[in-house]
């Protein structure tokens, strides 16, 4: 364990063999705690079958830590309106965990690993950002939300929706766990707070808000890998590399028509060195 910790601190790749199913999870936990225990954990597996085992074992050691799978996208990429908003929100949550915005456990299958992602900087640039005290026109904000793919409704009761009444605008960003209530005083932002979607009660005051886009823009560049999203203290575990690469090779052959949307096996091997 000490040698593994030293290698991780030096950002080196380590290879372990001879661990059983339960032992893998135990070692992951021990390694994570020995490092600092404050970062997210990313577990990369060949299939979802392995995810079920890791999810069960890691939940025992981290019962309060949220878990999320980075679900693969449908290729060719299509507008999210024809996909599930819940899946889109789950992907956004997984990427937040990887980037260290929140601590959590992320599971990534070979299929998801192989797909190219939007560059983090580009996704950040397309967000709608609002700060307390900022002067903003409510109608312009609502138009921007429509441009980003959000649906206007009478009342917000699901992710990806927004609703307006008087000087109040409610929105449920796909990159947040709760909806947010934005309040105006004249043209200035006077209140930003999350609220419970069932009781409508306020939960947490915010200084700023960043709303991610739902719409897939034609100008977006998908050139990033999962590893480009990982923060410095995100612990990346690659389970059964031989089986993983066999599965990646299979997906690469099956997705030849979409070669521009996926990484080659050799490229992914290079990322892991």
What are these regions (language model features)?
Residues 1-273:
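ASCE RecA-like P-loop NTPase motor cores
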């Amino acid at each position: 364990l000490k040698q593994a910790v030293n290698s991780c601190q030096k950002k080196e790749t380590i290879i372990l063999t001879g661990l059983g199913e339960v032992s893998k999870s135990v070692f992951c936990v021990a390694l994570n705690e020995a490092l600092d225990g404050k970062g997210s954990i990313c577990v990369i597996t060949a299939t979802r079958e392995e995810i079920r085992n890791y999810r069960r074992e890691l939940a025992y050691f981290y019962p309060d830590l949220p878990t999320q799978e980075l679900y693969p996208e449908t290729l060719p990429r299509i507008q999210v309106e024809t996909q599930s908003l819940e899946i889109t929100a789950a992907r956004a949550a997984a990427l937040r965990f990887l980037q260290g915005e929140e601590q959590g456990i992320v599971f990534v299958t070979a299929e998801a690993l192989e797909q190219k992602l939007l560059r983090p900087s580009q996704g950040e640039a397309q967000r709608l950002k609002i700060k307390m005290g900022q002067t903003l026109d409510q109608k312009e904000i609502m138009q921007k939300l429509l441009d980003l793919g959000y649906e206007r409704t009478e009342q917000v009761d699901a992710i990806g929706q927004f609703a307006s009444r008087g000087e109040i605008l409610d929105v449920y960003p796909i990159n947040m766990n709760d909806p947010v209530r934005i309040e105006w005083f004249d043209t200035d932002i006077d209140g930003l707070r999350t609220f419970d979607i069932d009781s409508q009660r306020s939960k947490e005051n915010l200084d700023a808000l960043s709303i991610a886009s739902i719409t897939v823009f034609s100008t977006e560049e998908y050139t990033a890998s999962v590893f480009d999203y990982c923060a410095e203290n995100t612990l990346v575990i690659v389970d059964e590399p031989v089986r993983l690469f066999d599965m990646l090779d299979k997906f690469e052959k099956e997705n030849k028509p979409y070669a521009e949307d996926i990484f080659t096996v050799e490229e992914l091997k290079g990322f892991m060195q």
